Amino acid sequence: MTAPQPHTITPPTPGSKIVLIGAGDVGIAYAYTLVNQGLTDHLAIIDLDERKTWGHVQDLNHAVPWSHHNTRVTVGTYEDCRDAAMVCICAGAAQKPGETRLDLVAKNTAIFKTIVGDVMSHGFNGIFLVASNPVDILSYATWKFSGMDSSRVIGSGTILDTARFRYALGRYFDLAPTSVHAYVIGEHGDTELPVLSAGSVAGTSIHHRLEMIGESADEDVDEIFVKTRDAAYEIIQAKGSTSFGIGMGLARITQAVFSNQDVVLPISTLLQGEYGFEDIYIGTPAVINRQGVRHAVELQLDSEEKERFDHSANVLRKVMGEAGLI
C-alpha cells in the first residue's frame, strides 16, 4: 500500500466535542469517565445497536446532574464528525478467551476501512484516538485510511500496560503507583516489554531498589511483569472483557489533548527513526498536546531491552505485511 497523501496540515477542529464509535464495554467505560470528569461538552455515540446505544445515552445523561459539568450526550451519526474535535474508535470484533490481539487483524482492518472512510467523508478534521485491538496495527491502518498527518492519529498503545505495571510495582514497594515511573513499550500484546533501566521509584532507580532488596527481587519483578502482560487474558476469562482501566487511560489521553498539556504518555504513535524503525505504529512514550502527538520520546534501552523491542516491532511488521498494510 502506498503512503497516504496527508491533508494540508491545519489546526485541528477546536472545542471538545467527541464522537465515540463503538458502545461496547470499553467505549461505555470511556464515555462514563468523560462525563464524570467533564472532559467534553458534547459526546455523540455511534453503534450498530441503536436501541442499546439510546439506553446508554439516557443513562449517561442521568449521571450529568451529579457530575458538576454540563455535558450533553446524544445518539450520534457520522454527520457529527464534521465539527468533532476528536473521534474515538472502540468498535470492532472483541478479543475472545484464548484469542490473541493479533488474531483480530483481518476482521478489524476491514471494519476500520469502512469506519474511517465514513468519518473522513463527513469532513472530519480533528484527532483520532484508537482503542480497538490490535491497537498498534489499527492505529497504523487509521493513519493510512484517513490520509491524516500521523500526529492526528493516536493509539492507546501501552497506556494500560504501563498503568498495570506501575500499580503492581507500587504494591510490591508499598508505595502509591503515582510514585512509580516505569514504562511498558512495544506491541500492546504478547511481545511488549518493561523498561526497567530507565525506571524509578520515589526518585530512586528501580535497579538500585532491587539491589537493596536482594537476589530474589529480580525474579519478583519478572513475575510482576508476566502478570502485567497476561492480565487481560485473566480478566477476560473472569468477566468477559477489560474496560475500566482502558476507559480511564483513554480519558487521560483526551485530557492531555484538550488541555494542551505537553505531557509524556505511553501511547501508540508512528516511529520516524526512533529506536531504528520507521513506518510503524508501536507503544512508546510521546509528548501529547492540542495538536495530537508532538513527538515520540525515545527511551535509552539497554542491550536486552533493545533486542526485545526489535523483536516486538518486527512481529508487528510481519503481521502488517500479511494484512497488506505495508
From Swiss-Prot:
InterPro entries listed in its UniProt record: L-lactate/malate_DH, L-lactate_DH, L-lactate_DH_AS, Lactate/malate_DH_C, Lactate/malate_DH_N, Lactate_DH/Glyco_Ohase_4_C, NAD(P)-bd_dom_sf
Keywords: Allosteric enzyme, Cytoplasm, NAD, Oxidoreductase, Phosphoprotein
Annotated Gene Ontology cellular component terms: cytoplasm
Known catalytic reactions: (S)-lactate + NAD(+) = pyruvate + NADH + H(+)
Catalytic residue list: H188 (proton acceptor)
Binding site for NAD(+): V26, D47, K52, Y78, G92, A93, T114, A131, S132, N133, S156
Gene3D superfamilies named among the record's database cross-references: Lactate dehydrogenase/glycoside hydrolase, family 4, C-terminal (3.90.110.10), NAD(P)-binding Rossmann-like Domain (3.40.50.720)
Superkingdom of origin organism: Bacteria
Pfam family membership, one: Ldh_1_N
Disulfide pattern: none
SUPFAM superfamilies xrefs: LDH C-terminal domain-like (SSF56327), NAD(P)-binding Rossmann-fold domains (SSF51735)
Pathway: Fermentation; pyruvate fermentation to lactate; (S)-lactate from pyruvate: step 1/1
Binding site for beta-D-fructose 1,6-bisphosphate: R166, H181
GO biological process: glycolytic process; lactate metabolic process
Phosphotyrosine found at: Y233
Role noted for this protein: Catalyzes the conversion of lactate to pyruvate.
Assembly: Homotetramer.
Family: Belongs to the LDH/MDH superfamily. LDH family.
Protein name stated in the entry: L-lactate dehydrogenase
Species assigned in the record: Corynebacterium jeikeium (strain K411)
